[in-house]
C-alpha cells in the first residue's frame, strides 16, 4: 500500500513542516505502526499502544486504524516547557480494490464481450419468425384513399338520440 505510506508521510510532513529540535519518525514495519521521538513520548488520548522504550511507541496493527494524540517532551538542553503534540490519524481502506490500467482494460473488455453476447442472444431469439403468416394478414386495407373517417358499423342509436331533446342547442 504505497498510498498509505505516502499519506502518513504527508500527514507527518504537515505537522513537522517548521524547524524544530524534535525528531518525530513514523515507521511501518510489516503490519504494525510505530511512532518515535528523539525525546520521551507520552500518550494523551486515543489508541494507547505499547510503549517499547521511552522514545518509541507501538500503535498496533495498521488494519485496526490506530489514531490518537501523543506528546513529545522537550530535549534536555531546551526549555522544559516546550512540547510538541503529535496527532496520528491512520485510516486503511479494507474493502478497496486497486484500479490500475490492466484492471480497467479487463473491465472494459468484459463489458464489450457481455454486450455482444447479449446482442447475439436477442438476435437469435427475436430475429427468426417461428411460423409464416397468411398473405391476407400481411396487407389489410383499413380505409380507402378518398375516405377521411371509417364509417360506423350498423347500430341502434335510438336511446342516445333522445337524451338531450329538451335542451337548447347552439348552432
From Swiss-Prot:
Disulfide bonds: 37-72
Extracellular-side segments: 22-104
SMART domains reported in the protein's UniProt record: ITAM
Superkingdom, natural source: Eukaryota
GO terms, biological process: adaptive immune response; cell surface receptor signaling pathway; positive thymic T cell selection
PROSITE patterns according to UniProt: ITAM_1
Protein name, entry field: T-cell surface glycoprotein CD3 delta chain
Organism expressing this protein natively: Sus scrofa (Pig)
